[in-house]
Amino acid sequence: MSGIIATYLIHDDSHNLEKKAEQIALGLTIGSWTHLPHLLQEQLKQHKGNVIHVEELAEHEHTNSYLRKKVKRGIIKIEYPLLNFSPDLPAILTTTFGKLSLDGEVKLIDLTFSDELKKHFPGPKFGIDGIRNLLQVHDRPLLMSIFKGMIGRNIGYLKTQLRDQAIGGVDIVKDDEILFENALTPLTKRIVSGKEVLQSVYETYGHKTLYAVNLTGRTFDLKENAKRAVQAGADILLFNVFAYGLDVLQSLAEDDEIPVPIMAHPAVSGAYSASKLYGVSSPLLLGKLLRYAGADFSLFPSPYGSVALEKEEALAISKYLTEDDAFFKKSFSVPSAGIHPGFVPFIVRDFGKDVVINAGGGIHGHPNGAQGGGKAFRTAIDATLQNKPLHEVDDINLHSALQIWGNPSYEVKL
């Protein structure tokens, strides 16, 4: 294979999956085949999409009810020749799912890139090992927290929040994705002030924390803004990838003048991936494509919290981010939303140690503030790695957290 293989979930009311697959393969490549003269067929053969797999799935009554018709469900795979497209994500996505995405009854499940095609993508600049080296933390999950309630607040409020989270033992603190450039907390001021706070905490407590600042602005201003952030001392760039596009992420990741990790936020991605019947699968969108395009971290809904993904999907995202690949470094999985200390054993059991545990309210909502919330999580992480049940840990911060949010992991064993 020198091109790309697309895997689709299709729904066909004519009950002929093979015919539907062939129509897609032709429609996204040469347009027609059987009516072409033999000589023209020979000339266009190397450009034709080839159906390489058709698998019928069991009938699904809920799907029939939703579509208001009886359909045959199936998984199909089509190989698209590399000759047909340039080696970039806009061309690849338009080739494999462009006008087909308007069908409303087809879901792009996966894209399998040839080795030749992979060479055109950067992958993470730092990856898991590089991030761990920055923090000098190699033996446990990382802990991340979020600034909360920053809109309309000044830089002093940001510094107080950042200090409390860092003292609590948080490894990474990230901006809220809805904090944009503003007069009260402009980009470079956040970075410079944040570095002063984090250096002070490091000198006092010996704990290193990184700050992920939100990269925002018009698309053609992003590189300049990113370079300003780097010059100001930014540790990590948070980026709302799907508000801009995967190719924009790749452009940032490939720029040698932006030598910092990039954290991909999933905002807007639900518009592409939420439906089970159409769109793009979450594992492909938030896993494989983000990693290929250069994200060092990928945030996605956890299977446990307030905006939950199905566990199978969340684990598939993580698999794409962390599986061995000779072309790409591994990206950090960041299962998010509604996470509190009682979920830590679940997260470690399901995602392993190479994961970032991301909490907002689970840290800020602690009765002892963000310092207590961070310490509760760190204690829960240590106990989990020792295979010690959380309710047996003698720690006031963890005990308070479990009283407030519960201990759903009571029986979990690694």
UniProtKB/Swiss-Prot annotation:
Q: Name one GO molecular function term.
A: magnesium ion binding
Active site at: K99
EC numbers on record: 5.3.2.5
How are cofactors bound according to the entry's free-text note? Answer: Binds 1 Mg(2+) ion per subunit.
Which positions carry N6-carboxylysine?
A: K174
> Tell me, how does this one assemble?
Homodimer.
Other known facts: Has no RuBP-carboxylation activity.
| UniProt-recorded name of the protein | 2,3-diketo-5-methylthiopentyl-1-phosphate enolase
